[in-house]
């Protein structure tokens, strides 16, 4: 087993322990607690795969971190913080849109890559726009907060959201989830369009001229994927 893999796991275990202490002392917010639960499940899975005990790994991780901190200067810390890119947040939806409750007449749900896809299969022949709130790092979608599908009159007919109890998701997970959602809605002859932010940061597409939300190749891939699932 690669020593760097073991060391990385040990440090992750110890840092999770520190975050857990903050949570136990009510020194963190709800998103922090959500990430803590997701990361706990991920660490258990990694520990099982690597055949490492979590308690032992945590203690070893503490030693590694302490050794690093002994040689760390305040100046080095300032340089590291200044050079680290910070994610920025994109908000297609207002607070009202992202928090509004909605209901499905013919519900369909699917879990993919740590994301829950929900859609109302009773919706037919509608023009639908996808909007999302998410963080961006290095000009690419990093973490999805919520994606919802709206009809022209503002009704919510579908949604993609992270599952708190599961590990985090990747950009590819988000793309796949959007593909499932688009395919499911287009199955009932709905016309789907993604916001410019989704196009740009999920697929790297700029759509200033009002073109289709996805390139033909991506559309064909999604259609094939969904046909096998619907």
Swiss-Prot record:
**What SUPFAM superfamilies does the record point to?**
Ns1 effector domain-like, S15/NS1 RNA-binding domain
- Record-level GO BP terms: symbiont-mediated suppression of host cytoplasmic pattern recognition receptor signaling pathway via inhibition of RIG-I activity; symbiont-mediated suppression of host gene expression; symbiont-mediated suppression of host mRNA processing; symbiont-mediated suppression of host PKR/eIFalpha signaling; symbiont-mediated suppression of host type I interferon-mediated signaling pathway
Location of the region described as CPSF4-binding in the Swiss-Prot/TrEMBL record: 180-215
**UniProt-listed Pfam families:** Flu_NS1
User: What family name appears in the similarity comment?
Assistant: Belongs to the influenza A viruses NS1 family.
Q: What is known of its domains?
A: The dsRNA-binding region is required for suppression of RNA silencing.
Protein's name in the database: Non-structural protein 1
Q: What is the lineage of its organism?
A: Viruses, Riboviria, Orthornavirae, Negarnaviricota, Polyploviricotina
